[in-house]
Amino acid sequence: IETAAGKVTAPAYIYMGVRPDTVAIALGLGHTAYGRFAQNIGVNAYDLVPAGWDAAGGLALGGLKGKVTITADKSPLVTTEGSARQHGRGIGQALPIGVLLGTEQENDEHHHEIPGLPSQDFKTGLKSPVAADAQGEFANPESKDQGMYDPNHVQKMEKRRWAMTIDLARCTGCSACVTACYSENNIPTVGAPYQGRALSPSQWDERPGANIIKGREMAWIRLERYYEGNDNTENEFSPDFDTRFVPMMCQHCGNAPCEPVCPVYATYHSPDGLNVQVYNRCVGTRYCSNNCPYKVRYFNWFGYGEPERRQYAWPEPMHWSLNPDVTVRGKGVMEKCTFCVQRIRESEHRARAEGREVNADEFTTACAQACPSRAIVFGDAADENWTVSKLAYDRRAYHVFEELNTYTAVVYLKKVNYPAPASPAKA
């Protein structure tokens, strides 16, 4: 794209929200002098704007003539979203504002009734988490052999159910939660180690996006985007469609499908409702990932500290930014969202040292803390004083794949759709 002020070279991504005779490029993005770790990442559309001012004193952005040229450069554009269509699975659900106002009936096309399992049973799953038999001797409070743990403490923990609500009406898809999770939990980036440099044939597998194409992505939160309201599947332009963003992380199921298939008990259920992963037990069978209906467990394909593959290591001084409360995982093990268990335990230890209970909403996860629209709320769903316990029973609440009887700890709130304003021709 070239104007009299300058030119930029950017990849083309076909999106049905942009007219076919239009090119949209964001202002203010791209890094050209941000250090060696972000060198030549993206472009800034301000490079196309001359230093002129309009009558109001602002930068003149209108009236510029530009030229768009197709180059011969090719590079894969990779996303981790998967399908842009829900195919009737009801992952990202919505309802019209009229339903909340009581002026129309809800057409719940994604509601699934299971014989013998009322749809409201998930509330019981939140209030009374399924205690795993990994803590076998604690399952019976009358047991005389309580091991090394205080039985009163264990029973108190079983009354908790750490849970999360995600309001799809507030989520804008900004990915702040994803970035915060990377920073908080020492998650390595599987990206483009040779960005901006020519590749030899031996380095072809290291080209931008190559490892993501192979399914080797690493992110504890996956931001899914779905299109509704238009039947075209070729991403052709359409003025009438609905976009829904769904942050997808480990659902910390009460009946977790990943737990019974692990041959070494690397994943188990904690008394307070967490789906726990023990890294030094894991041998990398990936059975848990195969059995997870939400596909939120990830395998470490690379050794991020191996001296012979330094392109994947944490380069200096970036290793000083690692969170000391979270261990760095090695190649060959599975990992996933932990509900920021380090923050949970730190809060519990502080409360115990001060001789009190954990106060409602006194801490939260990294993703909830970073969310600018407060779409994510975390807390104890079994304690009515926590905000999450109130939101979990909102009339918009639903669970993804509720019919699987997994009793997930993540509750989504349906997006609220407003009627489209009448066009001048129809007004």
Segments (PLM) and residue ranges:
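Flexible loop/turn segments at secondary-structure boundaries
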Residues: 7-9, 18-21, 31-33, 172-173, ...
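C-terminal, active-site-flanking charged/polar segments
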Residues: 1-57, 284-296, 367-377, 381, ...
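Ferredoxin-like iron-sulfur electron-transfer modules
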Residues: 147-173, 233-257, 263-287, 296-366
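Short microdomains enriched in Cys/His and/or Lys/Arg
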Residues: 199-225, 281-291, 312-325, 358-375, ...
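Carboxylate/His-rich catalytic cores and anion/metal-binding grooves
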Residues: 174-236, 283-301
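Long, contiguous, secondary-structure-rich segments that constitute the structural scaffold
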Residues: 1-163, 169, 180-183, 192
